[in-house]
């Protein structure tokens, strides 16, 4: 049976990662959290106080402490920078609020996209992000673009933060998500947009199971036809 490449794109908190992880597990595919890679680069910049004028230093740190993914005992995915487990720290609000400017740096994107394509070569992979279908995997057999209202996405982020013990204000989250939407869709390098051949799916009011079922059925149909 052919193993395909699945690209899931969409704005912040549209449910990409949650859905991608479930589908990867169901299909026995590899899940690559590209957002965690950009968050890791952002964490480096913030930890060292680097600005957008010091891209070479961020890349140097990435080379010294490469990003890797490992499985935890419960099956969840852990993110490492060198030997440091950064799974939780890269989800903190300061990283979330700065990831847009770091991910907009051409040199950072070029390096991480190169890493992502190398991992995806064999197929049997599902990636989620902002530009997977348009830039990273333009040859993906299935491209999905998830959207949802700002209100719904803020609600999801608020619940996620509660579960992780991160304090947050609902109204502030709404403002931050709207601001990030604008930044992501207006940046010069790889702006957030749906690929021409992507299936656009509005997840507002749709359960996670409903979104998973929609994407998985499309994937299985493509595999059956190949």
Swiss-Prot record:
GO BP field: nucleobase-containing small molecule interconversion; pyrimidine nucleotide metabolic process
Catalytic activity: CMP + ATP = CDP + ADP; dCMP + ATP = dCDP + ADP
Gene designation: cmk
One MF annotation (Gene Ontology) recorded for this entry: dCMP kinase activity
Keywords: ATP-binding, Cytoplasm, Kinase, Nucleotide-binding, Transferase
EC number: 2.7.4.25
Compartments (UniProt record): Cytoplasm
Binding site for ATP: 10-18
Cross-referenced Pfam families: Cytidylate_kin (PF02224)
Keyword Phosphoprotein (UniProt): no
Name of the molecule in the record: Cytidylate kinase
Disulfide bridge map: none
Source species: Streptococcus pyogenes serotype M6 (strain ATCC BAA-946 / MGAS10394)
